[in-house]
């Protein structure tokens, strides 16, 4: 289960996010961030189910979604919304051998908001209390250090790809697959049924 939650009932000052039309709503704003993570980890699903709603007073676009990605051996739940006052884990993975819980995702956005520059070996490095925790049968919970986040490496790859010096880290097909999930989620929410991917 992946969450990208906020607590902010106010409308965005960016009107393209708040007016009905192509690319509007939370599915296009926060959705791609967790959809691409799920597809990167688990591949393309076989089916998609989604529930999207308008929860903020006066909103004209969906601002809450829950998507289920169906795989032969598992399901992956993706959620995002604006009314999560108490933080829930950003990542929860549960299986036969145990569970992995991570309370928050990458810290780079918070660091940028705090005015820090994306440079140096400590950039994107999490505090130990923010590491994920692995729980396994017969063992004590164990903190799992995260790799340092590095937005700049992504943009450097884009630059190098445009110059023909590297293959893109995110392919056109990756983007298309994320859009297929969004399209299936919108169709599912409208029809209230599971959609073939």
Residue ranges and their predicted role:
Residues 1-58, 192:
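Predominantly a Rossmann-like dinucleotide-binding segment in NAD(P)-dependent oxidoreductases
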Residues 60-64:
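A short, glycine/Asx- and small/polar-enriched loop/turn
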Residues 34-35, 151-156, 182:
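A general structural signal for well-ordered alpha-helical segments in protein cores
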Residues 187-197:
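C-terminal capping/lid region of NAD(P)-dependent oxidoreductase domains
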Residues 32, 79-87:
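Glycine-rich phosphate/pyrophosphate-binding beta-alpha loops
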Residues 67-73, 93-96:
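Active-site beta-strand termini and strand-to-loop segments that position acidic
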């Amino acid at each position: 289960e992946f969450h990208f939650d906020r607590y902010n009932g106010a409308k965005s000052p960016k009107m393209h996010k708040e007016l009905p039309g192509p690319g509007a709503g939370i599915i296009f704003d926060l959705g791609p961030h967790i959809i691409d993570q799920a597809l990167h980890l688990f591949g393309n699903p076989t089916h998609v189910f989604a529930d999207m709603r308008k929860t903020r007073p006066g909103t004209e676009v969906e601002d809450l979604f829950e998507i289920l990605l169906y795989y032969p051996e598992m399901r992956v739940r993706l959620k995002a919304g604006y009314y999560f006052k108490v933080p829930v884990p950003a990542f929860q993975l549960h299986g036969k051998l145990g569970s992995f819980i991570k309370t928050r995702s990458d810290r780079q956005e918070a660091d940028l908001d705090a005015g820090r520059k994306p440079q140096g070996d400590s950039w994107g490095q999490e505090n130990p209390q923010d590491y994920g925790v692995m729980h396994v049968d017969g063992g004590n919970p164990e903190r799992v250090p995260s790799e340092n986040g590095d937005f700049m490496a992504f943009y450097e790859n884009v630059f190098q790809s445009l110059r023909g010096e590297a293959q893109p880290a995110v392919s056109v097909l990756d983007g298309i697959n994320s859009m297929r999930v969004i399209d299936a989620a919108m169709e599912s929410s409208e029809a209230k049924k599971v959609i073939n991917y």
